[in-house]
Amino acid sequence: KSLLIREKLVEGFDEGLVAKEGLLAQGRGEAFDYLLGEKTGKAATNAIKTAAAQLLLAKMPVISVNGNIAALCPKQIVRLSKQIKAKLEVNLFYTNEKRKKAIIKTLKKNGANEILGSNNASSRKLPGIDSARRIVDKDGIFVADVVVVPLEDGDRTMALRKAGKTVITFDLN
């Protein structure tokens, strides 16, 4: 399974979806999985159920999409967004327009209709973040009550929490 994930990420890198740093983040996560035994424990199972409940109860859920998500599971993330009526928003730590367009193209190819995060006129700044992830869409993460943020870094989680949002994060390993 690990080799398949690695191949999908390398393919995603070659297609312009994944940043070099995204390859490293995946490798770092895999190292922890190997050390911890790659099992979903009882606490994690409870967290998954709680996250699912939060998503079903959300009034304005948004799924933040990065290159790793677009490379590894675009079909599944689009399906999830439709099932829970969540908006999809491209929000990147290492951002450039070419990469955003490649991610949007991949999501659309997998059934997404509307994808936020590429219209500069809709951009707002989320206070408390120094990286490019501070730029969010006024109709997406900025107004969301629940935000799904795969491969999360702590500063954005803290900023989203301070903005009154419920944050759901998970590791793609």
Go through each PLM region and give its residues:
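Long, charge-dense
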Residues: R79, Q83-R133
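Alpha-helix C-terminal capping/helix-to-coil transition sites in glycosyltransferase folds
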Residues: L57, F142-V143
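Short, ordered loop/turn segments at secondary-structure junctions
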Residues: G67-N68, N91-T95, L172-N173
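Hydrophobic beta-strand scaffold residues
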Residues: P61-V62, K87-L88, E114, V167-I168
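Glycine-rich, acidic loop regions that bind phosphate or pyrophosphate groups
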Residues: V148, E152-N173
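Electropositive, gly/pro-rich neighborhoods at or near active sites that engage anionic ligands
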Residues: K1-K87, E97-R99
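Active-site glycine-rich loop that binds ribose-phosphate moieties when present
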Residues: S123-F142, V148-R156
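Short amphipathic alpha-helical segments and helix-helix/interface helices
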Residues: I77-S81, I104, K138, T157-M158
